[in-house]
């Protein structure tokens, strides 16, 4: 699936027409993760659909969802901007950024410098770079470009070999372990436990995918994760406000 998405992304890049720079002020994604509202930082995802599950939320209203997440004391937001596979839009990110005070991550499949420029212009505070989608040197170049634009970078990896290849080139400030197996699409938070041993001291570790209950939060925290990225389990609920409270075992 990842290869299919990347192939499509290569085609779409050729059609990108950069929009006017919205000049929205940058917020520090990393600082928000390091000063969380709870025992582990929450990056709450604004996500309409996925390739495996189809439409997750009918009547999708990104700004309303983002405001509920903010009210529920999420630390950062992640907004899907990929259209063909996730039914996302750049405008969703810009609208969300204008409506809340939280840092916003652009969740997309970034493989080219024009996408980094685009992320900056639409108001992203951080971008996602996927280790399995890029050669380590290319990833480093895009990483540096984003940092020069004032954005943070979440470097996501699924497997040990990918992470080791990246660490041979440079040490990212933020590493996300995606708990989804790219071969069978199953998720296990045990992947965070295995990968945490490879993450250098001083790097912020995020656990992503397959997190749906408070026990998962406690488990990945004990493994060394300082933050979690949660999307589908929150988006499936009718109220994202209540969904966040439920995830943390709180009374909303």
Swiss-Prot record:
The keyword Amino-acid biosynthesis applies. GO terms for biological process: L-tryptophan biosynthetic process. Keywords: Amino-acid biosynthesis, Aromatic amino acid biosynthesis, Decarboxylase, Lyase, Tryptophan biosynthesis. It holds the Pfam family IGPS. It catalyses: 1-(2-carboxyphenylamino)-1-deoxy-D-ribulose 5-phosphate + H(+) = (1S,2R)-1-C-(indol-3-yl)glycerol 3-phosphate + CO2 + H2O. PROSITE patterns: IGPS. Pathway: Amino-acid biosynthesis; L-tryptophan biosynthesis; L-tryptophan from chorismate: step 4/5. GO terms for molecular function: indole-3-glycerol-phosphate synthase activity; phosphoribosylanthranilate isomerase activity. Coiled coil: none annotated. Its EC number is 4.1.1.48. The keyword Membrane does not apply. PANTHER family: INDOLE-3-GLYCEROL-PHOSPHATE SYNTHASE (PTHR22854:SF2), TRYPTOPHAN BIOSYNTHESIS PROTEIN (PTHR22854). Belongs to the TrpC family. This is Indole-3-glycerol phosphate synthase. It comes from Bacillus licheniformis (strain ATCC 14580 / DSM 13 / JCM 2505 / CCUG 7422 / NBRC 12200 / NCIMB 9375 / NCTC 10341 / NRRL NRS-1264 / Gibson 46). The gene is trpC.
């Amino acid at each position: 699936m990842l290869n299919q998405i990347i192939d499509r992304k290569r085609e779409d890049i050729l059609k990108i027409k950069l929009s006017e720079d919205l000049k929205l002020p940058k917020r520090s994604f990393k600082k928000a993760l390091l000063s969380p509202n709870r025992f582990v930082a929450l990056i709450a995802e604004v996500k309409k659909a996925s390739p495996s599950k189809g439409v997750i939320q009918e009547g999708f209203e990104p700004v309303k969802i983002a405001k509920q997440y903010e009210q529920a004391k999420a630390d950062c937001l992640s907004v899907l901007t990929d259209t063909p596979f996730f039914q996302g839009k750049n405008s969703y990110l810009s609208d969300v950024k204008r409506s809340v005070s939280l840092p916003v991550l652009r969740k997309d499949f970034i493989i080219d410098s024009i996408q980094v420029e685009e992320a900056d212009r639409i108001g992203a505070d951080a971008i996602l770079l996927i280790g399995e989608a890029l050669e380590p040197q290319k990833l480093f170049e895009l990483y540096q470009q984003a940092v020069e634009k004032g954005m943070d970078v979440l470097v996501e990896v699924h497997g040990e070999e990918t992470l080791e290849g990246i660490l041979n080139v440079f040490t990212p400030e933020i590493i996300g372990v995606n708990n989804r197996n790219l071969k069978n699409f199953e998720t296990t938070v045990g992947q965070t436990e295995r990968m945490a041993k490879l993450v250098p001291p001083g790097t912020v570790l995020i656990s992503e995918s397959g997190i749906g209950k408070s026990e998962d939060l406690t488990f990945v925290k004990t493994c060394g994760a300082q933050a979690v990225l949660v999307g589908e389990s929150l988006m499936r609920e009718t109220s994202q406000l209540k969904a966040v409270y439920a995830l943390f075992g709180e009374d909303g």
